C-alpha cells in the first residue's frame, strides 16, 4: 500500500507531462526529418546550389534554397516540412515567392523521406536521403522521369 501511495505522484506527473503541449510538440517533431537540419552546399564547376534547414521544432522545419551559375542567382525558394493538424506530414514549396504547393509525405525511413503530388506540373516527387555525410535531394515526375539530383555537403559554421 505504501509503495502504491509513493508511486502515485510519479504516475500523475508522468501523465501530466505526456499530455502537456511540450510533449505534443516533441511527438510532432519526432515525425520530421531532423537529420536534414543544417546548411548544405553543392558546387559543380560554376554551378552552385545550397539549402538551409532549421531544426525540427513546434512541428515544423523551415528551409530556404537557391541555385546559381557563377555570380548569378538562377532560382530560389522557401520551403517547409510540417506536421499538419491531422498528424500527416507535408512538404510545402514556394518557388520565388509564388503560392505554396503541397506535397504529402509518401515514404519515410530513418534516413530518407519522400513527398509526392501527381497533380503538380513539376516536380511531382521530392526525395531527400542521407548517403554517408552527404544530403542527397532529387526531384522528378511521379514515375521518376526527368529527374534532377543534388548531392550536398554540410557546411560547418565558423567557430567563435
Mark where each language-model region is.
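N-terminal helix-cap/turn-to-beta initiation motif at the start of protein domains
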Residues: 25-39
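Bacterial N-terminal signal peptides
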Residues: 8-19
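Edge beta-strand at a domain terminus
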Residues: 22, 100, 110, 130-160
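Bacterial N-terminal signal peptides that target proteins for export
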Residues: 1-9
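Signal peptide processing junction and immediate N-terminal pro/mature segment
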Residues: 19-25
Amino acid at each position: 500500500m505504501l509503495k502504491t501511495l509513493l508511486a502515485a505522484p510519479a504516475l500523475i506527473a508522468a501523465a501530466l507531462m505526456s499530455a502537456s503541449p511540450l510533449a505534443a510538440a516533441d511527438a510532432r517533431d519526432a515525425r520530421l526529418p531532423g537529420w536534414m537540419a543544417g546548411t548544405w552546399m553543392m558546387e559543380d564547376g560554376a554551378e552552385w546550389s545550397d539549402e538551409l534547414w532549421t531544426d525540427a521544432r513546434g512541428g515544423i522545419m523551415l528551409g530556404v534554397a537557391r541555385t546559381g551559375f557563377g555570380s548569378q542567382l538562377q532560382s530560389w525558394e522557401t520551403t517547409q516540412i510540417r506536421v499538419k493538424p491531422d498528424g500527416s506530414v507535408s512538404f510545402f514549396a514556394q518557388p520565388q515567392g509564388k503560392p505554396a504547393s503541397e506535397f504529402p509525405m509518401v515514404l519515410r525511413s530513418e534516413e530518407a523521406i519522400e513527398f509526392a503530388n501527381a497533380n503538380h506540373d513539376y516536380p511531382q516527387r521530392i526525395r531527400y536521403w542521407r548517403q554517408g555525410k552527404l544530403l542527397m535531394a532529387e526531384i522528378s515526375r511521379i514515375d521518376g522521369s526527368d529527374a534532377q539530383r543534388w548531392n550536398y555537403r554540410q557546411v560547418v559554421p565558423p567557430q567563435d
